[in-house]
Regions:
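N-terminal non-globular leader segments, chiefly Sec-dependent signal peptides
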Residues: 1-40, 45-49
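Short, compact, well-ordered microdomains
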Residues: 50-85
Length: 85
């Protein structure tokens, strides 16, 4: 079976920390986002190429290579990405 490696692409991302950086996330994506409250969680709704996805506190919001935005769980983000200069 052929194997493939991800191309080294530098991305922009911001970790969603909840209400405290909601405005920073909105500036990053360039528009106001809907924030829902589920119990004590503050969940963001993000328009992606595949439709609406939810971002929970702790998730990273990533700007993709086509300028699209999508959420990524922190454990996946940390396995996939490392800081770039």
């Amino acid at each position: 079976m052929p194997k493939y490696r991800k191309k080294p692409v530098v991305i922009e991302a911001v970790q969603y920390l909840g209400k405290q950086n909601y405005q920073d996330i909105c500036k990053f994506v360039g528009k106001e986002l809907t924030m829902e409250y589920m119990d004590t969680e503050q969940i963001l709704t993000i328009e992606t190429l595949e439709g609406e996805l939810k971002a929970n506190k702790g998730d990273y919001i990533i700007k993709g290579v086509q300028g699209e935005f999508y959420p990524c769980k922190p454990d996946i983000f940390e396995k996939t990405y490392e800081p770039a200069e």
